[in-house]
Design a protein with these regions (language model features):
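Short, acidic/hydrophobic/Gly-rich beta-strand patch recurrent on exposed beta strands
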Residues: 46-50, 55-59, 100-105, 138-142, ...
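A cross-kingdom feature marking solvent-exposed beta-strand/loop segments within repeated
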Residues: 53-77, 109-115, 119-120, 146-168, ...
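DE-rich acidic low-complexity regions and acidic surface loops
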Residues: 20-22, 110-119, 190-205, 270-278
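Short acidic, gly/pro-rich beta-turn/loop elements at beta-sheet edges
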Residues: 57, 95, 112, 137, ...
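Surface-exposed interaction/gating patches
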Residues: 119-149, 157, 178-180, 190-232, ...
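A short acidic, glycine/proline-enriched capping/turn motif at secondary-structure boundaries
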Residues: 54, 62-63, 83, 89-95, ...
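Short N-terminal signal/transit or membrane-insertion segments
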Residues: 15-25, 60-70, 104, 108-111, ...
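OB-fold/S1-family RNA-binding modules
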Residues: 1-49, 70-99, 126, 134, ...
C-alpha cells in the first residue's frame, strides 16, 4: 500500500451505508479517512462514518500519546481536518446505538513499518506542511506521522521564518537528510536547484522582481529565487520581506555573485510562491550547489 500525508488521497475519504459495510472494511484492514468533528474532554476524536459514529480513543490517536512523547495538542489540532484510521471493532452506546472503535495509531505503525522505516538518506518523498514554527516547518510524511525541516534546510536564500517560504496545508517534495532511531530530518533546498540552475533564468540588463532578505551596512541581499540571491548597494527605507524591482547588473558564476540595482521598492510584503523543483528523481546521493569553477564549494553528501 502507498501511504500519503493525511487528506491528500481522495480514495480514502469514505462514508458507509451500513454497519456490515464497515465490518467488511475492518476485516480487510482497510485504511479510511474522515474529517474529525470533535475532540472531547478525554481527547477522544469523533468522526461521522455515515451508518454509525466513529470514535478514536485518545491512546489510539497517534504514535507517542501513550508514552507522552507526543502531546495531546496533536489530537486537539486535528478537529475539522481529515484523519486516517482502521476499524478495530464495535461497541454500543447508552442508547444501544452502534459505535465504531477506530485507531489512527494502527495506520501510523503500519506506515512506519511498511514505508518510513525503509527510507534512507537521499530518498525524495511527498509531504504536506502541518504547521510552522520559527525554527522550522513540521510536515506530514505519511498517515499523519510528523517530521521537521529545520529553517536552514528550507532554501539557500536565508529567511527569518518558514512562513516566508511555505504555508500550512501546502503539498511539497522533501528529501531525507538524516535518519536517527527516534526521528527523521528532512530538507527542501537540495530539490530547488543549483546556483547555475537558478542563475540561468536571469540575464544582465533585465529588470526583475525580488524580495529583500537581509539589510547590511555594505548592501542589501535580494532573493531572486529560493536558492538564489543577489547583492544590491545600500538603500534607505527598506524592510526585510519587502518586494522590490531590481536591475540585473552582472552575473559572475565563478564567485557565485549577482550584482543588482534596486529600481523600485513596493509597500507590500512578499507571500510564499509556488516552488519550482529541479530534481525529478526519487533518490539523490549527492547535491552540489556551487558551479564547478567556483572558488567556494557548497554541497550535500547524503551518504555521509
Amino acid at each position: 500500500m502507498k501511504f500519503y500525508p493525511e487528506g491528500k488521497n481522495p480514495d480514502l475519504l469514505k462514508t458507509f451505508d451500513s454497519v456490515d459495510e464497515l465490518k467488511m472494511a475492518m476485516i480487510n484492514n482497510e485504511v479510511i479517512e474522515s474529517k474529525a468533528l470533535l475532540c472531547d474532554r478525554e481527547h477522544n476524536l469523533h468522526v461521522d462514518l455515515g451508518a454509525v459514529r466513529g470514535i478514536i480513543p485518545r491512546l489510539e490517536g497517534a504514535i507517542g500519546i501513550d508514552d507522552g512523547s507526543v502531546r495531546d495538542i496533536a489530537l486537539i489540532s486535528k478537529v475539522n481536518k481529515r484523519i486516517c484510521f482502521n476499524v478495530l471493532g464495535f461497541e454500543k452506546d447508552i442508547y444501544d446505538n452502534s459505535i465504531a472503535i477506530l485507531s489512527r495509531k494502527a495506520v501510523q505503525l503500519r506506515c512506519m513499518e511498511e514505508y518510513l522505516n525503509r527510507l534512507v538518506p537521499g530518498d525524495v518523498i511527498d509531504a504536506s506542511v502541518t504547521h510552522l514554527e520559527k525554527f522550522g516547518a513540521f510536515i506530514d510524511i505519511g498517515a499523519g506521522v510528523n517530521a521537521l525541516i529545520p529553517i536552514d534546510m528550507l532554501s539557500v536564500s536565508r529567511i527569518s521564518h518558514p512562513k516566508e517560504r511555505l504555508s500550512e496545508g501546502q503539498s511539497i517534495k522533501v528529501v531525507l537528510r538524516k535518519k536517527e532511531p527516534s526521528k527523521m530530518t528532512f530538507s527542501l533546498k537540495e530539490l530547488l536547484g543549483t546556483w547555475e540552475d537558478n542563475a540561468k533564468n536571469f540575464t544582465p540588463g533585465e529588470t526583475v522582481t525580488g524580495v529583500v532578505r537581509s539589510i547590511e551596512d555594505y548592501g542589501v541581499f535580494v532573493e531572486l529565487a529560493p536558492n538564489l540571491a543577489g547583492l544590491a548597494e545600500p538603500q534607505n527605507n527598506l524592510f526585510v520581506g519587502q518586494q522590490v524591482a531590481v536591475y540585473v547588473k552582472s552575473v559572475i558564476p565563478e564567485k557565485m555573485k549577482i550584482k543588482l540595482v534596486i529600481v523600485e521598492a513596493f509597500s507590500d510584503a512578499d507571500v510564499p510562491k509556488e516552488l519550482t523543483y529541479y530534481i525529478e528523481d526519487r533518490h539523490i546521493d549527492y547535491f552540489r550547489y556551487s558551479p564547478q569553477n567556483s572558488s567556494k564549494q557548497i554541497f550535500t553528501d547524503f551518504n555521509e
